[in-house]
């Protein structure tokens, strides 16, 4: 019943928010290979994305319109009302970065095992002004992907929201097969580290591809 209510509320928000988000973001979607991975996601998957703004979440909702995204969210967002209630109704996965509570990982794995799509921002926070982007990735996304044995879909956004001169650009990458990083000859930590590093490299590569596409169109 709770899952049905979450999916209903997501659908309501996306239908009623479609026009406002078109005006606010004007999102242009590019693809690494559309024949392999477009906007439709079949079966369980993890979406990873670079993190530029709290509005990254909203953009992902509409990029992958046909699926209900269960996105990991920091505790600070749930502490602000009525935002916290809204995110809870949207099915946000509570992540408390100030404690050693890893229940969000079990919750994410459980959702994936029932065919759902989980969204993760592996940087775990917004970069500061002078920090190199993307920030180093936390290992939890790789751990969950390997444990649940699901593909990882990388997404890069330029973070240009509410900008009349420059629209939002998003590029969807081809899925990463976690089996390529699950080597029985290595330790669990080594496999997690390999996948974590590979995910960050894919995000960086997608960012460069998006920049190249933008330069070609000038």
State each model region's role.
Residues 4-8, 105-218:
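Non-catalytic C-terminal accessory region of glycerolipid acyltransferases
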């Amino acid at each position: 019943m709770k899952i049905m209510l979450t999916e209903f509320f997501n659908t309501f928000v996306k239908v009623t928010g479609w026009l406002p988000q078109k005006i606010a973001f004007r999102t242009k979607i590019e693809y690494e290979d559309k024949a392999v991975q477009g906007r439709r996601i079949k079966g369980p998957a993890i979406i990873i994305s670079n993190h530029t703004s709290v509005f990254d979440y909203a953009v992902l909702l509409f990029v992958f319109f046909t699926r209900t995204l269960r996105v990991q969210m920091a505790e600070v967002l749930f502490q602000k009302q009525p935002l916290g209630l809204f995110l809870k109704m949207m099915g946000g996965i509570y992540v408390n970065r100030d404690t050693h509570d890893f229940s969000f990982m079990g919750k994410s794995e459980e959702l994936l095992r029932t065919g759902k799509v989980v969204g993760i921002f592996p940087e775990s926070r917004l970069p500061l002004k002078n920090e190199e982007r993307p920030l180093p990735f936390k290992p939890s996304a790789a751990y969950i992907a390997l444990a649940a044995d699901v593909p990882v879909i990388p997404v890069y956004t330029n973070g240009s929201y509410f900008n009349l001169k420059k629209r939002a650009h998003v590029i969807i990458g081809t899925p990463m097969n976690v089996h390529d990083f699950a080597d029985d000859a290595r330790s669990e930590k080594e496999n997690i580290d390999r996948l974590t590093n590979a995910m960050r490299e894919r995000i960086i590569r997608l960012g460069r591809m998006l920049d190249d596409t933008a330069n070609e169109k000038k």
